[in-house]
Design a protein with these regions (language model features):
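Hydrophobic/aromatic-enriched cytosolic interaction surfaces used to assemble or bind macromolecules
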Residues: 1-209
Length: 209
């Protein structure tokens, strides 16, 4: 399930037919899909707006990060977080010698979980929605993947890095070596020309993760 903006319709990915469907709310999601499984509570993976997540690529090594502990990792986000750092949930992804830290306000997590719970659903995974975009083939700042629709604008620059975009010209200034932008079709366009745009969206990798 993809929540593109805080109050936007939900987008639901159908793996069997490789297509998105829009629903207005969690309750409508339950009404439509409630009979798909017999268990009382349905499990969903929620892709939330990337604007809610903070990211830090730490230069500390594994031992130093372990010594910091959870509270120490929270304070790595002190300069960028509007939420008190004690109220941040932290996740760490390590690739080779690189350590990527992600922070999300606990209040956001609880709000999404509560919305799903009221509709009889259970969120089992939370992921920033830039991960729906395919990974650029050139990840040294030379190529980025861009997605835009009426609800959001997203950018992915590498396997573990991406963001919500508010003003595109400023973003381009951050990538002085940029040579290629891969633009994905909006999922809203699928409903205008499903035979063409849906095929492009599937082949380009949106929601293939």
């Amino acid at each position: 399930v993809w929540l593109r903006a805080q109050h936007s319709p939900l987008a639901v990915w159908h793996e069997d037919i490789k297509q998105w469907q829009l629903v207005d709310s969690w309750q409508q999601l339950h009404d439509i899909y409630g009979s798909y499984k017999t268990n009382s509570q349905k499990s969903v993976c929620l892709y939330f707006p990337s604007s809610h997540v903070l990211q830090v690529e730490s230069e500390l090594n594994t031992a130093q990060l372990k010594q910091l502990g959870m509270s120490g990792k929270q304070y790595l986000f002190e300069e960028t977080s509007l939420t008190p750092v004690e109220q941040l949930a932290i996740r760490q992804v390590t690739e080779n010698t690189s350590h990527h830290l992600y922070a999300l306000a606990q209040s956001d997590i609880e709000a999404w979980q509560q919305s799903a719970k009221l509709a009889g659903m259970n969120i089992v995974a939370l992921l920033p929605d830039f991960l729906l975009l395919p990974t650029p083939e050139e990840c040294a700042g030379q190529q980025i993947v861009l997605y835009q629709d009426q609800q959001t604008m997203l950018l992915r620059q590498s396997l573990h890095q991406g963001m919500a975009v508010s003003y595109l010209p400023l973003i381009f200034e951050r990538f002085p070596h940029l040579s290629e932008v891969l633009l994905l079709p909006a999922i809203d366009d699928i409903f205008d020309d499903s035979s063409t745009v849906f095929h492009q969206a599937s082949n380009n990798g949106l929601a293939e993760n």
